Amino acid sequence: MRLIGLDGEQLGIVKIADAFRLSEQSDVDLVEIAPNADPPVCRLMDYGKFKYQEQKRQAEARSKQKVIQVKEVKFRPATDEGDYQVKLRNLRRFLEEGDKAKVTLRFRGREMAHQELGMRVLERVRDDLIELAQVEAMPKLEGRQMVMVLAPRKKAVGKPDAAG
């Protein structure tokens, strides 16, 4: 088998018995790295320490990942302009933070007869956020509410910014 030492140096091709003896003398483990290679490749290492460092690396990678959440903002067909602007600002903030936004438009009572008003509100939201978001799920009616899902647009990579 081909043997790799503690510091990653090549120890060459050795017999299995010699490799086991070396690992016992050094008080480390003999770990098979590439069983399908010809000859198989083994390495002398402290396996417990290796597993610990591997777990630390995986935990660090997990902590760097951003969990995308779906934030919901509720509208009504007759939402006033001031309220509309506040809700739109919240949607902007959610999208800029990288979260998806679920825009829900709730119909009450006889408002169900005028679904086109609700559709207009959702289209207005879409048009106001066109530079920040793309529509992931087109508006659709679910019971007494119309739902649309917006996802943040991918930022263009390598685009020179205005500052310089």
Curated annotation (Swiss-Prot):
It comes from the Bacteria. Pfam families: IF3_C, IF3_N. Keywords: Cytoplasm, Initiation factor, Protein biosynthesis. One of its GO terms (cellular component) is cytosol. It is found in: Cytoplasm. Its main location: cytoplasm. One of its GO terms (molecular function) is ribosome binding. GO terms for biological process: ribosome disassembly. Monomer. IF-3 binds to the 30S ribosomal subunit and shifts the equilibrium between 70S ribosomes and their 50S and 30S subunits in favor of the free subunits, thus enhancing the availability of 30S subunits on which protein synthesis initiation begins. HAMAP family: IF_3 (MF_00080). Belongs to the IF-3 family. This is Translation initiation factor IF-3. It comes from Bordetella pertussis (strain Tohama I / ATCC BAA-589 / NCTC 13251).
